[in-house]
From Swiss-Prot:
Family named by the database record: Belongs to the MukE family.
Main localization of the protein described in the UniProt heading: cytoplasm
GO cellular component: cytoplasm; nucleoid
Species assigned in the record: Yersinia pestis
Location of region: Disordered: 207-233
This protein's name: Chromosome partition protein MukE
GO biological process, any: chromosome segregation
Its job: Involved in chromosome condensation, segregation and cell cycle progression. May participate in facilitating chromosome segregation by condensation DNA from both sides of a centrally located replisome during cell division. Probably acts via its interaction with MukB and MukF.
Keywords: Cell cycle, Cell division, Chromosome partition, Cytoplasm, DNA condensation
Pfam families in alphabetical order: MukE (PF04288)
Subunit text: Interacts, and probably forms a ternary complex, with MukF and MukB. The complex formation is stimulated by calcium or magnesium.
Locations listed in the record: Cytoplasm, Nucleoid
Length: 233
């Protein structure tokens, strides 16, 4: 085993960080120690994870994550359509002037209102009830599902709740996993809005896959197949 790889694996940070990466977490610059560790040992860890048929990726925005191949040896799971849509809205908010005005902090209510204003509400309600007529009960259930999606994305490192207040959160640069197609261009926010309204928030196989089940899904989101925590809701 190469000496520097041995040093990386022996580092006290590695066990917990390895578990987080395998669970689909994105490691951004806000996680100072973990991010610095990945920067220091990026080349060695790329070789290490290649043995499991996954790639250690450093995105243009600087965050790290694991991208599996179809033959990966690491268990995989996928995000739902609603998770994907919430992620797209988070990316849109990240690009908005309001993020600077609010010091990067948004509330769950603001997210929900933005979701309703940008996406087709009738389609959103289908996530709750395929035969939804737009009842108040269905709308309440939709709001609950949005909260569940937001919490799932938090575990993937897309947002951070503000202390013990789970109604407010800060968006991280990792949300660009949901906006790979808008990284270039004159108006990123307009491109993201177009993707949401055109239905492109729903990727192939209806999922942003952190541990996706096929190479086709790896192509969606600008070749950004992801690894998501396997959850039982």
């Amino acid at each position: 085993m190469p000496v520097k790889l041995a040093q990386a694996l022996a580092n006290t940070l590695f066990p917990a960080l390895d578990s987080q990466l395998r669970a689909g977490r994105h490691i951004g610059i806000d996680e100072l120690d973990n991010h610095a560790f990945l920067m220091d040992f990026q080349e060695q860890l790329e070789e290490f994870y290649a043995r499991y048929n996954v790639e250690l990726i450093r995105a243009p925005e600087g965050f790290f994550y694991l991208r599996p191949r179809s033959t990966t040896l690491i268990p995989r799971s996928v995000l739902s359509e609603l998770d994907m849509m919430v992620g797209k809205i988070l990316c849109y908010l990240y690009l908005s002037p309001e993020r600077l005005a609010h010091e990067g902090i948004f509330s769950q209510q603001e997210l929900y209102e933005e979701l309703l204003s940008l996406a087709d509400e009738s389609k959103l309600l289908k996530f709750v009830n395929q035969r939804s007529t737009g009842s108040d009960l269905d709308k309440q259930k939709l709001q609950e599902k949005v909260r569940t999606s937001l919490n799932r994305l938090r575990r993937l490192g897309m947002i951070y709740f503000m202390g013990n207040d789970s109604t407010k959160f800060r968006i991280t640069e990792a949300v660009f996993r949901f906006g790979a197609d808008v990284r270039s261009g004159d108006d990123q926010r307009e491109a993201q809005l177009r993707m949401i309204r055109d239905g492109e928030a729903m990727a192939v196989e209806n999922s942003l896959s952190l541990h996706d089940e096929s190479d086709d899904a790896d192509v969606t989101m600008g070749n950004a197949a992801d690894s998501v925590e396997d959850e039982q809701e």
